[in-house]
């Protein structure tokens, strides 16, 4: 017997719209069960998708997609959308090489109106679509679906401010679950969640005082009165909640509706039908529960935000509560987290800043041990960097823990607010290089290129876990802005010191002596260079720093070898290999140079090893490319 008879009938939103509205709650249950099964086996974003099931069904039921445009913010919650838009039978390939992307992707489906991965872009994109439709004389509807966490970012407010002053038909759906990845921070979430109802509570207190003695004498009356009191409180709080939210968004020029139960799919359909007929900017405030329908995720939405897989228990189609086995080798994130706590214990000036990535950036222990020196500024990368600059001006030692892909969002602040003033801010740049399943929106392939051209910046790339700690300590003590970039996942297994040793800034080291060919390698590619060099009897230099780069070492290697190969897990254009070429040109050295990095292409999602091989950066691919490049007599050696 088919466990999902309704879902089985749906291959497109057109099929969905043939259902009776009363069938939608049952469909929601089937879709949620399908999510538990599919994500449980393939992994992926979990809790946010469970919370968006009814909302997704209602949106596709009411709006004429793909003619009407649904723009999902970030895209963590887009799995139900993919299931309902013809990709149900491909869900087993989610985030795998050659399979479905973990986020909406325009080239994947006509229903994916806008490619996403970063937060707070949906309102601006949907507004642009609405403006284009008006200019072209169309009658389409544009809908932005954004979470309350993403709404804290400045870009979302910039778009709200612009939309409120434009005569376009735009609906913003605020999916309010009080979470982004971590619990939300800042004034806006408190504003949205405020339940201050002083007058009603005062009235209730008076009534209780006046009637309590009488009610005590009537059997069952007190219990009934308590239920009535609870209901009145709830209604009053909802009314106050709506009043406050209405005031905020209507001041932006939006007509506010809500808050609405985001898990009552039939009511959502009625509300959305009404909103679709309205003109001008509209905002629908929907209350949902992250992880809805799976208790473990409801109780710990941070832990279940994304999962590697959820094994079955006893054959049941339910996630397992078993924790994954800890890695034998520490991750670079763990190395950073331990270094940060050790350094903070020795230096009371150290403060840590994160743009809503406490868990991912390894700051959980730091927050617990040093809460007064921990700052989660929300999804606000630009503010995080400028805030760090202000702290540095007053003698503090800020460490900004940020993913490479998110540092892109704060580039002006890095240049204007930090580097031009030569402020000693340390950027711990996580997820540098290929990241795997999250794909191109999260790949850290551009930081070496955009950092090394910034004045006063020190840019370091460790080759293993111990070197990561060494370079963090070194850059922390530098009286200048600095960035240490390190990859996702585990390193080489190198023993990690507990000390605070430092190295000389701008100096690399020779890892292997060889002949004729010199590998000048950066960061994670040092291990690859060593593996290939064993087969080619080549020299390997671990440069450690991209800026300042070790000119003396480069010149010495160029003059003592026949050729040079540069290796980096970064874009070739403007990257570390380019820095090597600049040194050679400066010193008038003309030698054959092979630059190996990420070519001018958009990387895909999938297993990192497979992606590196496709990009020509695995050890096997590097050996093949170098042998093809070598003169025939050397390639045979």
Curated annotation (Swiss-Prot):
Binding of Mg(2+) occurs at: 148, 177
Give the EC number(s) under which this enzyme is classified: 2.2.1.7
Pathway, according to UniProt? Metabolic intermediate biosynthesis; 1-deoxy-D-xylulose 5-phosphate biosynthesis; 1-deoxy-D-xylulose 5-phosphate from D-glyceraldehyde 3-phosphate and pyruvate: step 1/1
Q: Which UniProt keywords apply?
A: Isoprene biosynthesis, Magnesium, Metal-binding, Thiamine biosynthesis, Thiamine pyrophosphate, Transferase
Annotated signal sequence is: none
Against SUPFAM superfamilies, the record matches this protein to: Thiamin diphosphate-binding fold (THDP-binding) (SSF52518), TK C-terminal domain-like (SSF52922)
Gene Ontology, cellular component aspect: cytosol
User: Which co-factors does it depend on?
Assistant: Mg(2+); thiamine diphosphate
Cofactor annotation remark? Binds 1 Mg(2+) ion per subunit. Binds 1 thiamine pyrophosphate per subunit.
The record's listing under InterPro entries reads:
Dxylulose-5-P_synthase (IPR005477), THDP-binding (IPR029061), Transketo_C/PFOR_II (IPR009014), Transketolase-like_Pyr-bd (IPR005475), Transketolase_BS (IPR020826), Transketolase_C (IPR033248), Transketolase_CS (IPR049557)
Q: Which Pfam families match?
A: DXP_synthase_N, Transket_pyr, Transketolase_C
GO MF annotation terms: 1-deoxy-D-xylulose-5-phosphate synthase activity; magnesium ion binding; thiamine pyrophosphate binding
Its top-level enzyme class, in one word, is transferase
Q: Which SMART domains does the record cross-reference, listed alphabetically?
A: Transket_pyr
Give the transmembrane region(s): none
- Catalytic activity reported: D-glyceraldehyde 3-phosphate + pyruvate + H(+) = 1-deoxy-D-xylulose 5-phosphate + CO2
Which HAMAP family does this chain map to? Answer: DXP_synth (MF_00315)
Q: How does it assemble?
A: Homodimer.
Return the PANTHER family for the record: 1-D-DEOXYXYLULOSE 5-PHOSPHATE SYNTHASE-RELATED, 1-DEOXY-D-XYLULOSE-5-PHOSPHATE SYNTHASE, CHLOROPLASTIC
What protein family is recorded? Belongs to the transketolase family. DXPS subfamily.
What does the function comment of this entry state? Catalyzes the acyloin condensation reaction between C atoms 2 and 3 of pyruvate and glyceraldehyde 3-phosphate to yield 1-deoxy-D-xylulose-5-phosphate (DXP).
Q: Could you tell me what this protein is called?
A: 1-deoxy-D-xylulose-5-phosphate synthase
